[in-house]
Amino acid sequence: MYKLVLVRHGESEWNKENLFTGWTDVKLSEKGISEALEGGRVLKQEGYSFDIAFSSVLVRANDTLNIILRELGQSYIDVEKSWRLNERHYGALQGLNKAETAEKYGEDKVLMWRRSYDIPPMPLEESDKRHPIHDLRYRGIPKSELPSTECLKDTVARVIPYWTDKIARAIIEGKKVIIAAHGNSLRALVKYLDNMSDDDILKLNIPTGIPLVYELDRDLRPIKHYYLGDEDKIKAAMESVANQGKKK
């Protein structure tokens, strides 16, 4: 049996302000730093250690991972970063307030944009400075692969090849793996691991900073999964994520 730990980054400054973030590189809030610290402490209390870590190229995920590894006394382990683990790209919604967007377009449409499997928001124009073609960290990636908007289906299409080529291979080699990423890149992976339907993934809420453990068989099929930490806090955190796209 293998164990895999997934962690959504702690609350970011834009999470706090209820803004669509996507590929915008936003730092952790004070609460987010505390969430990452607590996640590290819980993992330490439960006796977890890791051989390799995977993360996106966005600072909120990187900082969450660094805080957790410091708590574990494991800042020395290898960390592999990839844009394929980035948050879903929210297109022209990036920077907009979720509740205000719900007021303008209706909760149903915002929920569809946020959580539907195959309907992306309005795209960014390539001339828009928010488009990733203008970000030097992506200069080695073919322009055709950089999104101007994404639905979850698009996110799955970039996450799963990375899972297969890099992460799954490390697990099969016997390495203990932690992934620090984002709500939608982790939802993409969970959908794949649990073979969830397109409808069921709509209801999945992954809270910030709380370790999610997957126990996998030798073929990397899930045996069970569970969050580490206080059950009431976990429930409240999941409800908070679910309420982000509702009207004020």
From Swiss-Prot:
UniProt xrefs under Pfam families: His_Phos_1 (PF00300)
Decide whether keyword Translocase is in the record: no
Q: What is this protein called?
A: 2,3-bisphosphoglycerate-dependent phosphoglycerate mutase
The UniProt keywords, alphabetically, are: Gluconeogenesis, Glycolysis, Isomerase
Give its E.C. classification number. 5.4.2.11
Site feature Transition state stabilizer, where: 182
Task: Please give the catalytic activity noted in the UniProt record.
Answer: (2R)-2-phosphoglycerate = (2R)-3-phosphoglycerate
* Source superkingdom: Bacteria
PANTHER family associated with the record: PHOSPHOGLYCERATE MUTASE
Q: Which GO terms describe its biological process?
A: gluconeogenesis; glycolytic process
What the entry lists under SMART domains is as follows: PGAM
Question: What InterPro entries does the entry give?
Answer: His_Pase_superF_clade-1, His_PPase_superfam, PG/BPGM_mutase_AS, Phosphogly_mut1
